[in-house]
Every structure is written in C-alpha cells, then in structure tokens.
Amino acid sequence: MHALRSSVLALWLCLHVSVRAWMTYRSANGLDEYEPEDRIIFLGTKWCGNGNVAEGPEDLGPLKETDACCREHDMCPDLIAAGQSKHGLTNTASYTRLNCGCDEKFYNCLKNSAETGSGAVRFTYFTVLGTKCYRNEHPLICVKKGWFSCSKYELDKSQPKRYQWFDVSSNFAFPRMLT
C-alpha cells in the first residue's frame, strides 16, 4: 500500500509540475483566462483544486471529509484576490491568498481526516505550492531559514501589530505557535 501511495504521489507531482509549466507558458503568451476545462481538481473531490466542479455547496465527491475541508477553505470570508490589495497588502501572486486563520483551519481539517486523499491535498497546498497567507500580528523576524521558507520566526513585540504575509508550510508555524 505504501508503494502505491508513493507512486500516486510521484505521478501527481509530475503532473503538477507539467501543469505549472503549462500555466506559465499560457501566462507568458497572453492566455491568462481559465476555461472551466482548465481546472485541476483532485480525484475523488469536487472542491480540492483551482476552483470547483460542484453543483452546489452540499455536493461533495467520494472523499467527503477531504472535500468538506476544501469546500470550507474555498468559502473563507477574508481573502485577497490575485492583483488586489487589502489591509495594506497587495497580492502579487496569480491566485487568491487567504487569512492565515482560514489556512490554519484547512490544515487542521485535512490533518484530522482519516482519508488518504487528505494527505496529498495537505502536502500539495502546504508544501509544493509554497503560498503565503496574511494576518495581523507583531512584525516577524526570520531567525532560521529552511529549504523553501523561513523555518523559525520571532515576534518583535516592541513594534505594533500590522498585517503581513506569512509562509504557508507543512510545519504551519504561525506566531501563536511560536515559543
């Protein structure tokens, strides 16, 4: 079973890299608009991917727990769309970024799911994509760099809180979790 999971993950990662390359090509050639058929949705879900293919809020795929986590994440009320600004921050990414509270809830939901698919979704969103989230917190100082992001932060409590970007990683190290 472990070998099968590893093979599926390897296949998915290859597909993901190919899709990202295709998206980069499309963007570079003025083909930024997504068509419904351009959506990439995890197998067994209707909400886990870029957009959704659900017929309504109650429509979930066979991986119901995983899909419910993705649906709730998609419905986060505090977000900054690509190219938009809010809370003094501008989202320069080509996708929507969310308040860290929504991402943290998403991480915990996926982590607590017994479904195998939840691990692949969690790994992809929190490790492969290398996205960021935002929250109102004291300024952070990165005291230890990891492979792709900061692995340890310290809060500068002498400064007032402000909205700022945080790396979303598999460790999900947010200020309230720091020592």
Curated annotation (Swiss-Prot):
Subcellular compartments: Secreted
Keywords, ordered alphabetically: Calcium, Disulfide bond, Hydrolase, Lipid degradation, Lipid metabolism, Metal-binding, Secreted, Signal, Toxin
SMART domains membership: PA2c
Disulfide-bonded cysteines: 48-70, 69-109, 76-102, 100-133, 142-150
One cellular component term from this protein's GO annotations in UniProt: extracellular region
Pfam families with a match to the protein in the record: Phospholip_A2_2 (PF05826)
InterPro entries with a match to the protein in the record: PLipase_A2_dom (IPR016090), PLipase_A2_dom_sf (IPR036444), PLipase_A2_His_AS (IPR033113)
Molecular function via GO: metal ion binding; phospholipase A2 activity; toxin activity
Catalytic activity: a 1,2-diacyl-sn-glycero-3-phosphocholine + H2O = a 1-acyl-sn-glycero-3-phosphocholine + a fatty acid + H(+)
Cofactor note: Binds 1 Ca(2+) ion.
Listed EC numbers: 3.1.1.4
GO biological process: arachidonate secretion; lipid catabolic process; phospholipid metabolic process
The protein's name: Phospholipase A2
Organism: Xylocopa aruana
Taxonomic classification: Eukaryota, Metazoa, Ecdysozoa, Arthropoda, Hexapoda
